[in-house]
Each structure stands twice: as structure tokens, then as C-alpha cells.
Amino acid sequence: MSVRHQRPVFDTEPPGELDGRGRHGTVLCMSDEPAEGTARPESGLTDDDFSPIWADDDRPRIPRVAGEREALVAYLEYYRATVAIKCRDLTAEQARTRSMPPSSLSIHGVVRHLAGVERWWFQQNFERRDVPFLFFTEDDPGLDFDPPLDADFSADLGTWRAECVVSREIVAAHDLDDIARPLDWYEDVDLRWLVLRMISEYAQHCGHVDLLREGIDGRTGA
């Protein structure tokens, strides 16, 4: 499992003698990337020790200074990209592997679930489009997390990517203040709430995928 460690950024000299307040300088902020020229504690650890990164990471960087819309979209896209890189180089059998018993989760199941969630919130709820459910029936509501034996991982991954494309188009066509009344909800929601809801959804399942991938082939990295 990959763990990101934050470290303090100091506005004075690197840790040496304690100052009068019993600490090494003044901590300005917590950062997972040192500012240019910032001294690091002489711990002998490298950047990779602090924050191991996926070896072939090509995810879009999240801007540190951004407007509300840019920041929200950037975080959602980062999590989508995280799911994508954790699916790379997996066989269909590996993707179906329930590698963290007693959990019945698999990467294939998570991908199917996220495809359905993209459609459910953006198309079926926010824009009230008359489109069928993905991987869900009244007789078998768990078709997303429990793929049938003949389910094609590559095809389902493609379906998830296609749903993300449609979701992006919907977000681009609306203001964050635009209101919708979801099909199963009794209160209005705006697009801002919905994007935050999706960020929360992806953050949860990125943690699942992180563990599942490590259980499959040992690969780790934030």
C-alpha cells in the first residue's frame, strides 16, 4: 500500500538548534513537494521515501493556485487518471482477482461501478437523460461490483472511459451554480455539489484500487 507523508516547509534555517519556542524555525505550511530551494531535514531519506510515486505516472498535475472550477475539475481528472494507471498492464484474469480477502472487490468490479456512477450522476440525474443503466438490473443490482464470468475487462474499461468523456462534456456545458433535481433526491443540487460528490467517490475507490493492485502484483505508488 502506498502512503504519502507530508513534511513541514520551514521559513528559517534547516533544523539545527531549537529556537526559543522549542522548535526548529516557523512552519509555514505542510507540503508533499518541497518548494524550490527549500532545505530538507538531514534524515538521509530521498523524495521517493517521503512520497513513492507510480513508476510510469503521467497524470495531469493539479495546480496549486487555481480558480474554483479549475481546481475541482483538476482533482476529479487526477482521480480518474489514477484509476487508469492502476489498470495498466493487467490481464483480464488479474483484473478479476479478489486480491484482498475477505473483500470481494476486484479492479474489474470497481471500473464497472465507476462507469455506472458517471452515467448515473451526470447523465441520468443532472441532465435527466433517458439512458439505460449500466451493469445494473432490478434482479441483479450488484452486476457492477460482481462481473459475470463472460464480462470483458477491456470492453468495460472502454465503457468507463466513454462515460468519462460524456461527463466532461456535461460539466463543460454548465456553470457550477446550475441546479438539478436528482431522480432519487428530494433536494436540489448544483453542479458544484455533484463534482465534489464525484471527487469523494473516486477518492474512496482509488484507495480500493491501490490495495487491489498491490495484492495482484506488488506494484505500489501514490
Residues of each region from the PLM?
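Short linear motifs in low-complexity or flexible loops
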Residues: 2, 12-15
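Short, contiguous alpha-helical
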Residues: 30-55, 59-61, 69-142, 182-222
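Acidic/histidine-rich alpha-helical segments that form the ligand environment
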Residues: 142-178, 192-198
